Amino acid sequence: MPGGPGAPSSPAASSGSSRAAPSGIAACPLSPPPLARGSPQASGPRRGASVPQKLAETLSSQYGLNVFVAGLLFLLAWAVHATGVGKSDLLCVLTALMLLQLLWMLWYVGRSYMQRRLIRPKDTHAGARWLRGSITLFAFITVVLGCLKVAYFIGFSECLSATEGVFPVTHAVHTLLQVYFLWGHAKDIIMSFKTLERFGVIHSVFTNLLLWANSVLNESKHQLNEHKERLITLGFGNITIVLDDHTPQCNCTPPALCSALSHGIYYLYPFNIEYQILASTMLYVLWKNIGRRVDSSQHQKMQCRFDGVLVGSVLGLTVLAATIAVVVVYMIHIGRSKSKSESALIMFYLYAITVLLLMGAAGLVGSWIYRVDEKSLDESKNPARKLDVDLLVATGSGSWLLSWGSILAIACAETRPPYTWYNLPYSVLVIVEKYVQNIFIIESVHLEPEGVPEDVRTLRVVTVCSSEAAALAASTLGSQGMAQDGSPAVNGNLCLQQRCGKEDQESGWEGATGTTRCLDFLQGGMKRRLLRNITAFLFLCNISLWIPPAFGCRPEYDNGLEEIVFGFEPWIIVVNLAMPFSIFYRMHAAAALFEVYCKI
């Protein structure tokens, strides 16, 4: 039975401590104390309970996949104008899925409120505050989008189905309750009603994915119609232009307001798309955490400090301002005439090449710092971190598919417009930059977080090699009985003193040389500032590169070269499949970089 604070240690422990630590200095705790019998962390998973829980996980995942596949087929049937499948049928299916999720969330929130006095395990890595803040912002814009859709429905109420008015209202209610649910329960580790909860959570995951796919399809149809209208301007008259227009066949009152609402809806779709995919990822982590046994170590809260990142922030904000200017000029010039369209494409490629070169260089410097620093890796099981890494690689493949398609089209084309030679380095850099950035982010999220703030760590450097200060700290700990619960800075002080002293004795160095080795911590502040600037710069650059494709600046559509080589329909299918993943990659990379910044 472990002793309480201040209890004397056993003789064996005392002898081991005296051998490991210099005289007069208390030994560092080598391991956390044993857990009390009966605690959730102490009891390992029961052998008999693993089979039904694994079966429930398999059954729920298959249920979710069937819901998703069936929903995708409804979306496809509506997109290709299949007989007997109209927009009202699709909206009825999505509304029913949302209502079912609403019932489950209300039941879960009500049951949690009834059991609010119970202590429940939490996954401290899941549902970070900044992530919940981001999803709240996107949810607010999604609710505004729903209001615009309701106003659009009122304007065309004479010829629109009632489901087109019910759907945005249901979606707005679903969004508000889901954000409340994620704020309060994203960190939960569900240990009761696990089979039922698995089906409820996985239903929520794939409902959000279907809503995401619906938004992507609507936004892609709008972008494709605009692209078809611009192709004739670029001189590609051999491509048949057939607009896939779903405009209601009646007059709107007033017409100017309805036109403004229609344009406003499509400008808000990118934020709605990000909201749905973020919600599905947070719910997926909740699903993976059902029945999970957490370890006893408490996760240290990350505190983001925004001092010392002036250079990275200024460079990143400069890129952001340049991005907005490029997008505005691009949207004004593209499609006006062939010469203006070509100049807009060249301008975009030059801008993107410059930004990608800077981002690749920053990522290489950051990875080199990690190679020199040789910090230990965090090998603990973390569903949220694993999902982040998997999403980075999976969504990055969307851009790689488009880039390799452009490279192959340039190599096989019979005639090459002037902007072709800017498209080639741009496509190569997209591949290389994502490769480098993924390595930097993945290595960063697997590093152990800094245990002590920078100012405390610097203070520890100054006092660590003073034997009087170490002895005073040891006596203070002994008198207060806080060998385990003491201040992290003091505990780290003693640990560092012990380690430095032991290394000096083994190497035969004198005290002055040992002091020099201990002062190596001073270099850590410079490394951290450099890494913070790199991360801040990459964060703002990823936000910048998210803006052009999200708001219609898509050279993969507008240069026309790939459509000639691969054919119009095949290339459009490739772009419509890969572009949503490419757009989401930038936002997800920005979120991951923000988390990396807080860890440094």
From Swiss-Prot:
Gene Ontology terms: biological process: biomineral tissue development; cellular response to insulin stimulus; detection of gravity; inner ear morphogenesis; negative regulation of type II interferon-mediated signaling pathway; proton transmembrane transport
Activity control note: Activated by both acid and alkali, with proton influx in response to extracellular acid and proton efflux during alkali stimulation. Inhibited by Zn(2+); this inhibition is thought to be pH-sensitive. Currents evoked in response to mild acid (pH 6.0) stimulus may also be mildly potentiated by exposure to Zn(2+). Activated by NH(4)Cl.
Classification via InterPro entries: Otopetrin
Effect of substituting residue 554 to H: Increases sensitivity to potentiation by Zn(2+)
Organism domain of life: Eukaryota
Main localization of the protein described in the UniProt heading: membrane
Impact noted for substituting residue 185 to A: Does not affect alkali activation
Reported effect, residue 586 to E: Reduced proton channel activity
Free-text domain note: Residues involved in the gating by extracellular Zn (2+) and pH are located in the extracellular loops between transmembrane domain 5-6 and transmembrane domain 11-12.
Subunit and interaction comment: Homodimer. Interacts with STAT1, independently of STAT1 phosphorylation status.
Alphabetized PANTHER family for the sequence: PROTON CHANNEL OTOP (PTHR21522), PROTON CHANNEL OTOP1 (PTHR21522:SF19)
Protein name: Proton channel OTOP1
The organism of origin for this protein: Mus musculus
Taxonomic lineage: Eukaryota, Metazoa, Chordata, Craniata, Vertebrata
